Amino acid sequence: MRSDTVKTGFEKAPHRSLLKATGAIASNNDFRKPFIGICNSFNELIPGHAHLQELGRIAKEEVRKAGGVPFEFNTIGVCDGIAMGHIGMRYSLASRELIADSVETVAEAHRLDGLVCIPNCDKITPGMMMAALRINIPVIFVSGGPMKAGCTPSGKTVDLISVFEAVGQCSTGEITESELETIQDSACPGCGSCSGMFTANSMNCLSEALGIALPGNGTILAIDPRRNELVREASRKIVDLVNNDIRPRDIITRKSLLNAFALDFAMGGSTNTILHTLAIANEAELDFDFSELNALSAKTPYICKVSPATMDVHIEDVDRAGGISAILKELSRVDGLLDLSAPTVTGKTLGENIAGAEVLDRNVIRSIENPYSATGGLAVLYGNLAPQGAVIKTGAVSPEMMTHTGPAKVYDSQDEAIKGIMDGDICAGDVVVIRYEGPKGGPGMPEMLSPTSAIMGRGLGGSVALITDGRFSGGSRGACIGHVSPEAAEKGPIAALENGDMITIDIPNRCISVDLPETVIAGRIAALKPFEPKIKKGYLARYAQLVTSANTGAIMKNPAYCESK
């Protein structure tokens, strides 16, 4: 066992003395058992994590029963909703790397034999997964579970996105501040990750397809007693995984990544999942090119539409309809789409895991013969405005915006754009451009939920597009094109745009372009002043120096690597 490094032999007496002082060692016999880290992310700032202390307690109890010795430790976490719309959002994506590094540090420093990872919200799940693949010791994931959707006193189903959009409605006088407060007080009724197919729930659902979590991980509500049982089962299973030396890189392979992307496209997951899955592939040392995604999307039917794509279906409805296993079972009917031989932490293949699944509500999970669209709910666009690609959640775009040409309204920050939208500077037909908000430029590639919600709330969602080198919340809807690469701070073409330039978005043909000759674009870029970092001290300053482009997952490379590029 790895942990023998810190517990076996007479020379390790000081180590054993310290371990006994933790209170986790019941007797000397425990030094003959595997040491299992309970990698929790409990904190009282994130509603999706406020209940995880109890799940950690359950996990420790079950690991001990199964023959392991549990040691709980915590990672940091950021609530994207609370961090939205101010400098805090610049820390959100950057926190993913801190989480990965911190999990690596604890597991390696203390020579843990395995990990039960208990994440839930946006950057915590991928951060822990990146660490799991980096250190490659047996790991199982069990998330905290989704929040139940809210309900107003009048019976209207609402969620966090309802509140963001209500802010826009309030700004136009469509609703009163009192009505806004009612929505505010109804939308988030308790603990759990926000209730739609936003980033947190998307990643926790993908964990099932990747094979690193048990069936049910993505959809069983946080408040459902079955969530505690799932934690118990996962915590027993980790001891088996350690005893059989089954590691993350045995499970997360190229074929399981393709399975996860297929699920993502079938349920119209958050655009952030592409960013995170590319980063996960990097940690697994798997070559996966951004450009491959359109070919996979082309053969993946979009069969499960969940908020924000439709406001009357939430994760609890997906669970009731059969969960992720039912979606995967339906997708398995598409010839050659899924690799059902992919191994999973259950000890069975993906195909064996979903064999007994069935769709219980065709209004929630459609058949492959009757999809919302024949192609997936996410796409990568290319063109002279995004030569390295840009990402859009096609499943949340209204039909009239699938193709659109309009004049650019250019803003060099999210704050400027929000002010412009709220001041009424945006008209039907416009293409809002928010730049210098990419991984380096932001820094931290902040989410644009506030401006997209303001556009929706002001009734412009069917006539205005938004393009950015930043990213979007999983809750954004409309013609929202993000991850434009190269970013403005790297002198990508988006930096050359000026007000009035005509931009064409052609989603069916996966194209985004500006009506300018290449010579004009090149000339404007050549005239740009060198980018001046917005933040020059602390973690974000270091992050901005080391982070790579969105089309590679916005991962961090060491300075020598960056200089060689």
Swiss-Prot record:
This protein's pathway: Amino-acid biosynthesis; L-isoleucine biosynthesis; L-isoleucine from 2-oxobutanoate: step 3/4; Amino-acid biosynthesis; L-valine biosynthesis; L-valine from pyruvate: step 3/4
Active site: S473
Protein residues bound to Mg(2+): D80, D122, K123, E447
Keywords noted in UniProt: 2Fe-2S, Amino-acid biosynthesis, Branched-chain amino acid biosynthesis, Iron, Iron-sulfur, Lyase, Magnesium, Metal-binding
Signal peptide start-end: none
Family matches, as PROSITE patterns: ILVD_EDD_1, ILVD_EDD_2
Cofactor: [2Fe-2S] cluster; Mg(2+)
EC number: 4.2.1.9
One GO term describing the cellular component: cytosol
Function statement: Functions in the biosynthesis of branched-chain amino acids. Catalyzes the dehydration of (2R,3R)-2,3-dihydroxy-3-methylpentanoate (2,3-dihydroxy-3-methylvalerate) into 2-oxo-3-methylpentanoate (2-oxo-3-methylvalerate) and of (2R)-2,3-dihydroxy-3-methylbutanoate (2,3-dihydroxyisovalerate) into 2-oxo-3-methylbutanoate (2-oxoisovalerate), the penultimate precursor to L-isoleucine and L-valine, respectively.
NCBIfam families associated with the record: ilvD, PRK00911.1
Full protein name: Dihydroxy-acid dehydratase
Origin organism lineage: Bacteria, Pseudomonadati, Chlorobiota, Chlorobiia, Chlorobiales
Protein's gene: ilvD
